[in-house]
Design a protein with these regions (language model features):
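Glycine-rich phosphate-binding loops of nucleotide-dependent enzymes
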Residues: 1-278
C-alpha cells in the first residue's frame, strides 16, 4: 500500500504505483498528426442491421488507426462484428478492396487477411480449455508458411514460444492452459495469434478492457508497431482517452448512426466528442 499527499499525486505516479514500475516513454502515441496511406483497404457501404445500425458508411486506409467511439449501446460493437462477417447485415456491404471481395462470413474475412479481437475475450477470442500454444497456432501460422506447405509441430511450437517471448506473456510454458492465466496475459495470447496470422486488417473491440495499465501500455506499443508496418486497424473503444491517444481518425456513433468524424491533425476535443455521443 502506498499513501501519497495530494501535492504528490499525478497520473504518471499513479500508473507507476499501480503496476510496480515506471512506464518509459509516452503512454499512447507521441505524434499529433494523422499518418496513413492513401490506399483504401476496406469499404463499408450503407450498413444496416436489425434496428441497431443505420446506413453506416466509411473507408479504412492502409496504415490507419480508425477509432470508433460512443456510448456502450451506440452500435459500434455490432459494427465490429458485422465488419468481420459475424452478423448478417440487412442492407449494404463490406468490401476488401485489394481482392475486391465482399465479406460475408468470418471465413472469408480471415482468408483475405482480416483479424478480429472480440470484447468478449473468453467467449469468442480464446479456446479456454486449450493451451497457450494451441491458441496462438489456431490462426494457421500464416506468417511462416505458404499455401499447402507442411510445417512440423516443432516449428509451430517454436513460433508460439517466439510470440510468448516477444509479448512477454507470463506463463510456465506454452503448454499452460489459457484458463489459468490473468486477463492481461490472456489478451496477449489473443494478440499473439493474430501476429502469427500476419493479418493486414485488425478489428479491435475494446482490446484493453480488463487489463492493468502495464499491459495497456504494451498493447498500445504493439498497435503502434503494427501501424508502422502498414497494418490497418479499426479500434472500437468505450474509453475516450484511448481513442484520442491512438487514432488517426475518430468516428463517433449514436443510436446506430455516424454523427461525427474527427482527425488527429486537427486535435481531439474531449468535450466536443462527448457532445456528439449524447
Amino acid at each position: 500500500i502506498k499513501t501519497l499527499e495530494n501535492k504528490d499525486v499525478s497520473v504518471e505516479a499513479m500508473r507507476s504505483y499501480m503496476i510496480g514500475r515506471e512506464l518509459s516513454g509516452h503512454y499512447y502515441r507521441e505524434d499529433e498528426t494523422a499518418s496513413c496511406g492513401d490506399e483504401v483497404v476496406l469499404k463499408a457501404e450503407h450498413i444496416s442491421w436489425g434496428g441497431v445500425l443505420h446506413d453506416v458508411s466509411f473507408e479504412l486506409h492502409r496504415g490507419e488507426i480508425l477509432g470508433f467511439g460512443g456510448l456502450s449501446e451506440c452500435g459500434m460493437h455490432t459494427l465490429g462484428r458485422a465488419l468481420y462477417g459475424l452478423e448478417d447485415v440487412l442492407t449494404g456491404k463490406v468490401t476488401l478492396t485489394k481482392d475486391d471481395v465482399e465479406v460475408k462470413s468470418p471465413e472469408v474475412a480471415f482468408a483475405h487477411g482480416m483479424g478480429y479481437v472480440s470484447k468478449n475475450r473468453d467467449q469468442e477470442s480464446l479456446v479456454l480449455n486449450g493451451t497457450i500454444g494451441v491458441n496462438i497456432q489456431s490462426t494457421g501460422y500464416k506468417a511462416n508458411r505458404g499455401f499447402g506447405i507442411f510445417i512440423s509441430d516443432k516449428k509451430e511450437k517454436e513460433y508460439a514460444q517466439l510470440q510468448v517471448d516477444e509479448l512477454a506473456i507470463k506463463c510456465n510454458s506454452i503448454f499452460q492452459p489459457v484458463s489459468a492465466m490473468s486477463g492481461g496475459n490472456k489478451q496477449k495470447v489473443v494478440f499473439g495469434k493474430w501476429l502469427a496470422a500476419d493479418a493486414d486488417i485488425l478489428i479491435l473491440d475494446c482490446p484493453t478492457r480488463g487489463v492493468d495499465i502495464g499491459v495497456k501500455a504494451s498493447m498500445y506499443k504493439l498497435i503502434n508497431a503494427m501501424k508502422k508496418r502498414g497494418k490497418s486497424i479499426v479500434l472500437i473503444s468505450e474509453e475516450l482517452p484511448e481513442l484520442c491517444g491512438m487514432s488517426d481518425r475518430l468516428i463517433i456513433m449514436k443510436d446506430g448512426a455516424i454523427t461525427g468524424e474527427f482527425w488527429r491533425t486537427d486535435g481531439f476535443d474531449s468535450t466536443e466528442l462527448i457532445d456528439w455521443m449524447i
